[in-house]
Swiss-Prot record:
It comes from the Eukaryota. Its main location: plastid. This is Uncharacterized protein ycf40. The gene is ycf40. InterPro entries: Beta-grasp_dom_sf, Mopterin_synth/thiamin_S_b, Thi_S, ThiS/MoaD-like. It comes from Pyropia yezoensis (Susabi-nori).
Length: 71
């Protein structure tokens, strides 16, 4: 498998990583609980069921929103 570096944006901030990388792996690496986040990839809201099978590409834009319960 050939690895290459890609540049993506996470919540508007640049982030460099190796390709191939799945969305689930990246969320785990960044300590996000995938059951408590909403993720937009290039302006498309992704269901959690696609996190494992979605691989990131150069120049992708992610918005990760943490869902917090309260009362």
């Amino acid at each position: 498998m050939i690895h290459s570096n890609i540049s993506i944006q996470i919540n508007g901030e640049p982030f460099n990583c190796s390709k191939p990388i799945s969305l689930q792996f990246l969320l785990n690496y960044l300590d996000f609980n995938s059951e408590r986040v909403a993720v937009e990839l290039n302006d498309i809201l992704l269901p959690e069921t696609l996190f494992h099978s979605t691989y990131l590409n150069d120049q992708d834009k992610l918005e990760v929103i943490t869902i917090v319960g309260g009362g």
